[in-house]
């Protein structure tokens, strides 16, 4: 049997972990074999998952530590190899200097490469420390063995981190999917008005999901790249350690530096919990508001404007559903006194029962809406009020007005008896306003239909002494005010 064949056989019966001939070889499920001590140590250090499984150091296939099987055939081959005492490393491969054609028998410490006796005497290597190959081979053999131990530890840690990243990925997805389903279930009850809100919530969640997965995938990609570099370096070192002395020492400087300075870059903090979770109570509140609006809209009446009550500064549409101010526009109205002649009443009168109507005030910078108990005289003069507060006092329940209004483009106010005006907070500026009158309950309620029917303000527990009329005041804003038709 030739030495080449024996070397090939030796490679087949060498433990991939300790790189020595197999001792008491054990085989695992994938077919790879290892020394008994080596594979048991690997099983103890690389357990993952709830089933207590380990992964093969060669092909990473999972196996049960309890399924280790003695391989008597390999043990017999190892025994025969030990008897012939095969040691291929002692049969030196002879190579020649590419520059001088002489045998490469010397090793230059400074350059970390093999040289011939003529190279040693050249200017390039003058003053360098040179040794016979055999004198330094063991030093680098020991050095590489230590590097291999360190790099294998790094490799094991990298594999553990890969498993951890995979678990984080599954955990992340398991958080996202139930949350997505819960959001969709909650929104089913509000589908008619909440399509935009549902999409917004899902979009936010998807953005967070993509951001989290992007972080995980980046960490995974970086780890895969590092693992490949690590495997290449380990393969290079293993090839050098298993090959001839020439292969061991050829261009040793570069691989020495790579081995010494190689360090695993650990991934940055991985996401574990969603930053923001959808809260169902908010939807229940919105559902309650929606149901309240739906209830009052069941009393929707077809209100039209009464042209006999409109001032000359106002123009009504032919269908009497729209009113527009056409007088001199006031740039900075200082008080309600400047709007005294801008009102028009509805054609209907209400003395009992429940009634609802809607008004479109889109793009208007000023308006007043509600009900009044007595006809408004278009020629009424505010001269009797000597102050701005006096002008405001006209629009109070004690004077027969239950109204709210927009002033100075951004100020929403309710005109109560207790105060000249009560400032209202609007998170969403209303483009459509719903007015609900309950004569028996003595209430006038206003709803922001634009914001899914959120209540704006309610005048409550009033006694209405006479019939009430819908009240409309476009103020000095030329943008029209429009009554909406009842929806089916």
From Swiss-Prot:
InterPro entries in the cross-refs: B30.2/SPRY, B30.2/SPRY_sf, Butyrophylin_SPRY, ConA-like_dom_sf, PRY, PRY/SPRY_TRIM6, SPRY_dom, TRIM/RBCC
Main location: cytoplasm
Name of the protein: Tripartite motif-containing protein 6
Record-linked SUPFAM superfamilies: B-box zinc-binding domain, Concanavalin A-like lectins/glucanases, RING/U-box
Any one of the GO CC terms: cytosol
Taxonomic lineage of the native organism: Eukaryota, Metazoa, Chordata, Craniata, Vertebrata
Zinc finger (RING-type): 15-60
Keyword NADP on entry: no
Protein's GO biological process: antiviral innate immune response; cellular response to interferon-beta; cellular response to virus; free ubiquitin chain polymerization; negative regulation of DNA-templated transcription; negative regulation of gene expression; negative regulation of stem cell differentiation; negative regulation of viral genome replication
GO molecular function, one term: protein-macromolecule adaptor activity
Stated family: Belongs to the TRIM/RBCC family.
Job of this protein: E3 ubiquitin ligase that plays a crucial role in the activation of the IKBKE-dependent branch of the type I interferon signaling pathway. In concert with the ubiquitin-conjugating E2 enzyme UBE2K, synthesizes unanchored 'Lys-48'-linked polyubiquitin chains that promote the oligomerization and autophosphorylation of IKBKE leading to stimulation of an antiviral response. Also ubiquitinates MYC and inhibits its transcription activation activity, maintaining the pluripotency of embryonic stem cells.
Transmembrane segments: none
Reactions accelerated catalytically: S-ubiquitinyl-[E2 ubiquitin-conjugating enzyme]-L-cysteine + [acceptor protein]-L-lysine = [E2 ubiquitin-conjugating enzyme]-L-cysteine + N(6)-ubiquitinyl-[acceptor protein]-L-lysine
B30.2/SPRY domain location: 282-488
Keyword terms, alphabetized: Coiled coil, Cytoplasm, Metal-binding, Transferase, Ubl conjugation pathway, Zinc, Zinc-finger
Pathway note: Protein modification; protein ubiquitination
Subunit structure: Homotrimer. Forms heteromultimers (via B30.2/SPRY domain) with TRIM5. Interacts with MYC. Interacts (via SPRY domain) with IKBKE. Interacts with VAMP8; this interaction contributes to the activation of the type I interferon antiviral response. Interacts with DHX16.
Pfam families listed in its UniProt record: PRY, SPRY, zf-B_box, zf-RING_UBOX
Enzyme Commission numbers on file: 2.3.2.27
Binding site for Zn(2+): 97, 100, 119, 125
Zn-finger (B box-type) residues: 92-133
């Amino acid at each position: 049997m030739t030495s080449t064949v024996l070397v090939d056989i030796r490679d087949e019966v060498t433990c991939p972990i300790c790189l020595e001939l197999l001792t008491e070889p054990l085989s695992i499920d994938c077919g790879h074999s290892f020394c008994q001590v080596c594979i048991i140590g690997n099983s103890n250090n690389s357990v993952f998952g709830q089933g207590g499984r380990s992964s093969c150091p060669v092909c990473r296939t999972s196996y049960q530590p309890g399924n280790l099987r003695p391989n008597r055939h390999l043990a017999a081959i190892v025994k025969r190899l030990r008897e012939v005492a095969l040691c291929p490393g002692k049969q030196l491969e002879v190579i020649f200097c590419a520059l001088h054609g002489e045998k490469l028998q010397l090793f230059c410490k400074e350059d970390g490469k093999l040289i011939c006796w003529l190279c040693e005497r050249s200017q390039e290597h003058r003053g360098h420390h040179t040794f016979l190959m055999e004198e330094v081979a063991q030093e680098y053999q020991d050095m590489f063995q230590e590097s291999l131990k360190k790099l294998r530890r790094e490799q094991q840690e990298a594999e553990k981190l890969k498993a951890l990243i995979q678990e984080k990925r599954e955990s992340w997805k398991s958080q996202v999917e139930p949350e997505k389903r819960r959001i969709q279930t909650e929104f089913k009850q509000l589908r008619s008005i909440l399509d935009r809100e549902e999409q917004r919530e899902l979009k936010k969640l998807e953005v967070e999901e993509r951001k989290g997965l992007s972080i995980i995938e980046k960490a995974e990609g970086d780890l895969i790249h590092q693992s490949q570099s690590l495997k290449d370096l380990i393969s290079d070192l293993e090839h050098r350690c298993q090959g001839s002395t020439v292969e061991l020492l050829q261009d040793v400087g570069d691989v020495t530096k790579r081995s010494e300075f190689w360090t695993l870059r650990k991934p940055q903090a991985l996401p574990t919990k969603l930053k923001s979770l959808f809260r169902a109570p908010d939807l229940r509140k919105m559902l309650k508001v929606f149901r309240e609006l739906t209830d009052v809209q069941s009393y929707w009446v077809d209100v039209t404007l009464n042209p006999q009550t409109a001032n000359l500064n106002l123009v009504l549409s032919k269908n009497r559903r729209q009113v527009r101010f056409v007088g001199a526009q006031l740039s900075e109205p200082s008080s309600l006194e400047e709007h005294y002649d801008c009102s028009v009443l509805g054609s209907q009168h209400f003395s009992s029962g429940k009634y609802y109507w809607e008004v479109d005030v889109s793009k208007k910078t000023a308006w007043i809406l509600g009900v009044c108990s007595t006809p408004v005289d278009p020629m009424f003069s505010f001269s009797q009020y000597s102050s701005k507060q006096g002008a405001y006092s006209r629009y109070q329940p004690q004077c027969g007005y239950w109204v709210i209004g927009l002033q100075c483009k951004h100020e929403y106010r309710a005109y109560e008896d207790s105060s000249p005006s009560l400032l209202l907070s609007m998170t969403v500026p209303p483009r459509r306003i719903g007015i609900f009158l309950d004569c028996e309950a003595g209430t006038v309620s206003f709803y922001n239909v634009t914001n899914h029917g959120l209540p704006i303000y309610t005048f409550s527990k009033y006694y209405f002494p006479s019939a009430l009329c819908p009240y409309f005041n476009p103020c000095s804003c030329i943008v029209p005010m429009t009554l909406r038709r009842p929806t089916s």
